[in-house]
A protein has these predicted regions:
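Short, flexible, mixed-charge acidic loops at enzyme active sites
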Residues: 93-104, 237-240
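Short, acidic/polar
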Residues: 33-46, 116-131, 177-184
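N-terminal binding-site loop/beta-alpha segment at the start of enzyme catalytic domains
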Residues: 1-93
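Acidic (Asp/Glu)-rich catalytic clusters
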Residues: 12, 72-78, 130-133, 185-189
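Active-site groove signature of glycoside hydrolases
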Residues: 129-148
Length: 327
C-alpha cells in the first residue's frame, strides 16, 4: 500500500479495510458541482495513499457518486479493494429540475424514492451493480431508515441477510446519524457493521453512551463518518458549519478552544478529530469524504500524524471532551 495507512479486520466478516475509507458523497456533487476530472483526481489520490475501501450510495448525486467510483475502480483488480454501497432509495426519472435537490449539484435527471421493501432493495442493488460496473458489493448498508425502522428491519434487512447467507454480499449493516436508532438495529438484527455519522466526534460523543458498547458486546464493527461534523472540526473559523448548518456560537467557541489546546501540542485540530475517534476500541475505521485530491492528501496526513499522549487528557481536564473518552 502507498502510505502508512493500516488495514484492519472488519469485525467477523473476514474482510479487511483500510483504516480510512473514501467517502463518496462529495464527489456526487454535495453542496457544489464537482467536475469529472476533479473527482477522478480525488479517487486517484486516495488509491495512491493506500486507501482500498470506498463507500458510496445511490443517494449521493442520484447515482453520480456510484458511477464515478465504478469507472475509477473498473481498471483495478477486484480483490484489491472493498466496496460499500447502500439501499433504501430507488432512483427514478424526474419530471422537473433536480439540481440542488437534497444538496447535490451536477446530477443526472433522476429523483429518489424511499423503498425499504425486500423487492425494492433487491432491485436497488441490481441498479447499483450496473452503476458500479462490478459483479459484487462487499458491504450493503441500509441507508437512513429514520422513519422506516420496522419496514427496514422486516424488508431490507431480511433481504440483505438472505444475500449474505447466499454469499452474494459479505457484510450487512445500517448507516445513519441517529445513534439511538442504530443501537435499536444492533439489538434486533445480526449486523456486521454500522456506519454512524456525526455522533462520535470531538464535539458529539453521544454514540459512546449506548451504541458503541452495544457494538462491542455483539462484535459489530463501527465505521465512523462525519467526524469533522461537516467542517467545524477541520477549520473552526467564523461561519463554519456544524452538521450542515451554521454552527451555534457556543459550539464554535468550544471548537476554537479545542483548536487552541491542539496548537499547544503541535497538532492540527483535524488530526485530533481523526485520532480521537480511532482511539475508541469499538471503532474500526473512519469514513472521510473528499471532493478533490488536496482534501484526500490532507486527511491522510492528519491520520498518519503523531499525536502526543497528553493531548486528550488535557482536553478532558479542560472539560472539552468527556473524561471517559481518554481512558
Amino acid at each position: 500500500m502507498g502510505s502508512d495507512l493500516r488495514e484492519v479486520p472488519l469485525g467477523r466478516t473476514g474482510l479487511r479495510v483500510s483504516q480510512m475509507i473514501f467517502g463518496g458523497a462529495p464527489i456526487g456533487g454535495l453542496y457544489e458541482l464537482v467536475g469529472e476530472q476533479t473527482a477522478a483526481e480525488a479517487l486517484e489520490a486516495a488509491w495512491a495513499a493506500g486507501i482500498r475501501a470506498f463507500d458510496t450510495a445511490p443517494h449521493y448525486g442520484v447515482g453520480l457518486s456510484e458511477r464515478r467510483i465504478g469507472a475509477f475502480l473498473a481498471g483495478r483488480p477486484r480483490a484489491e479493494f472493498v466496496l460499500s454501497t447502500k439501499v433504501g432509495r430507488r432512483l427514478v426519472a424526474a419530471p422537473g429540475d433536480v439540481q440542488g435537490a437534497d444538496g447535490f449539484y451536477g446530477t443526472p435527471q433522476l429523483a429518489r424514492v424511499r423503498d425499504y421493501s425486500r423487492d425494492g432493495v433487491l432491485a436497488a442493488l441490481e441498479d447499483s451493480l450496473r452503476r458500479l460496473r462490478t459483479d459484487r458489493i462487499d458491504i450493503a448498508l441500509i441507508h437512513d431508515p429514520d422513519d422506516h425502522a420496522e419496514q427496514a428491519l422486516e424488508g431490507a434487512y431480511a433481504a440483505l441477510d438472505q444475500l449474505r447467507t447466499e454469499k452474494v454480499i459479505r457484510a450487512v449493516g445500517v448507516g445513519m446519524n441517529q445513534a439511538g436508532l442504530l443501537q435499536w438495529f444492533v439489538e434486533r438484527a445480526d449486523l456486521d457493521c454500522v456506519l454512524v455519522a456525526g455522533r462520535y466526534s470531538l464535539l458529539d460523543a453521544s454514540a459512546a453512551a449506548g451504541l458503541l458498547p452495544a457494538c462491542q458486546q455483539r462484535g459489530v464493527a463501527v465505521l465512523a463518518a462525519g467526524i469533522f461534523n461537516s467542517g467545524i472540526l477541520a477549520d473552526p473559523r467564523p461561519g463554519a458549519t456544524y452538521d450542515y448548518a451554521p454552527a451555534p456560537d457556543g459550539l464554535l467557541e468550544r471548537a476554537q478552544r479545542i483548536r487552541a489546546v491542539c496548537a499547544r501540542h503541535g497538532v492540527p485540530i483535524g488530526a485530533a478529530a481523526l485520532h480521537f475517534v480511532l482511539r475508541h476500541p469499538a471503532v474500526t475505521a473512519v469514513v472521510a469524504g473528499a471532493r478533490n485530491a488536496a482534501e484526500v492528501t490532507e486527511d491522510v496526513r492528519w491520520l498518519t500524524a503523531a499525536v502526543p499522549e497528553g493531548l486528550f487528557p488535557e482536553l478532558a481536564e479542560e472539560g472539552l471532551i468527556p473524561d471517559a473518552s481518554v481512558r
